[in-house]
UniProtKB/Swiss-Prot annotation:
Functional summary from the UniProt entry: The carboxylated form is one of the main organic components of the bone matrix, which constitutes 1-2% of the total bone protein: it acts as a negative regulator of bone formation and is required to limit bone formation without impairing bone resorption or mineralization. The carboxylated form binds strongly to apatite and calcium. The uncarboxylated form acts as a hormone secreted by osteoblasts, which regulates different cellular processes, such as energy metabolism, male fertility and brain development. Regulates of energy metabolism by acting as a hormone favoring pancreatic beta-cell proliferation, insulin secretion and sensitivity and energy expenditure.
GO MF, any single term: hormone activity
Family listed: Belongs to the osteocalcin/matrix Gla protein family.
Record-listed 4-hydroxyproline modification sites: 60
Cellular component, GO, one term: cytoplasm
Residues at which Ca(2+) 3 binds: 75, 81
Keywords linked to the UniProt accession: Biomineralization, Calcium, Cleavage on pair of basic residues, Disulfide bond, Gamma-carboxyglutamic acid, Hormone, Hydroxylation, Metal-binding, Secreted, Signal
Name assigned to this protein: Osteocalcin
Length: 100
C-alpha cells in the first residue's frame, strides 16, 4: 500500500513538472518590462487630489511641511545630509546654513 501511494505521488509530480516545462508564457508575461512602469505612469494610476484625501474622515487635509524646502536643500549637500542622519535635520541645517 505504501509503495502504491509513493508511486502515485511520483507520477503526479512528474506530470506537474512536465506540464510546466511545456507551457508557454502568456502575452502579458512575455513582454519585457511589463511588471514595471515609469514613475509618471504609476503616479497617474494612483493620483488623487490631496485636499479630498481625508474628507471621508471629517478631518481637514494636513498642511504641507514648511521646512520641506530647507530639508531638500540640506539633502542636496552630501555633508549636510550625512550630518542630518546623525544629529537631526534642523541642527544640521543650522550648522551649515544658519538659523532655520
Amino acid at each position: 500500500m505504501r509503495a502504491l501511494t509513493l508511486l502515485a505521488l511520483l507520477a503526479l509530480a512528474t506530470l506537474c513538472i512536465t506540464g510546466q516545462a511545456g507551457a508557454k508564457p502568456s502575452g502579458a508575461e512575455s513582454s519585457k518590462g511589463a511588471a514595471f512602469v515609469s514613475k509618471q505612469e504609476g503616479s497617474e494610476v494612483v493620483k488623487r487630489p490631496r485636499r479630498y484625501l481625508y474628507q471621508w474622515l471629517g478631518a481637514p487635509a494636513p498642511y504641507p511641511d514648511p521646512l520641506e524646502p530647507k530639508r531638500e536643500v540640506c539633502e542636496l549637500n552630501p555633508d549636510c545630509d550625512e550630518l542630518a542622519d546623525h544629529i537631526g535635520f534642523q541642527e544640521a541645517y543650522r550648522r551649515f546654513y544658519g538659523p532655520v
